[in-house]
């Protein structure tokens, strides 16, 4: 897999704002790319802010270590950090790394966006300090991702989706469930290796779903909105083209729907956040 080629940055670095390039076959609705303000600070994606309403439960799954495509880390980091800035008050955010052991990887971060209630309602300084702390802690956890799973030899986003589904079932009832997965679109494990379907991943969706279901490896995403971004074209080492990415989007739509979820977006980037680092 490609190396990360990433560089550390200060917390105040500007988020890229070029429009997202949506891939054929998996368009999303409400692609308003104008900036908005979430409780956690500046929200660079109005679309994302609309998805992460107050009191939601959010599982953020992000490629880690060698599963990050070369040159893509700045964009991946910007999208991951945007979740903290766009999430509504009271929204819980859990960050999980995507590695070759995604199902058993412990979360790197789990906390709720502070609400303006109790002492925070009468002390604005305390409230904004708490908000700032939430955003800073989430960003620090995101910055650890390139060093997580450095020896990984495969990528298991399905395992991360399964872990997210399990966590959401055990969480607060009545809240909106959202999974945001940021990775290159490929699954490479013994249970499912999409590289074997490289020419036409979408054409193998039904067979893959049957195999995953029979093996108990199909995630439980009932009632969950799923966002998949970070898909990367023009990767010479993986011979990935835009047509391949469109096929990957159709594949993941089939898997998510078979798991009981709804694929809201499948694209190179979140609307409002640059698709290139």
Locate the predicted segments by residue.
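Bacterial N-terminal signal peptides that target proteins for export
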Residues: 1-15
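C-terminal motif of bacterial Sec signal peptides marking the signal peptidase cleavage site
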Residues: 22-25
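Bacterial signal peptide processing site
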Residues: 27-30
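Von Willebrand factor
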Residues: 51-118, 121-175, 178-180
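Short beta-strand-loop
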Residues: 99-142, 193, 243
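VWA/integrin I-like adhesion module and closely mimicked acidic/polar interface patches used
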Residues: 186-244
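A cross-kingdom marker for long, charged
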Residues: 236-277
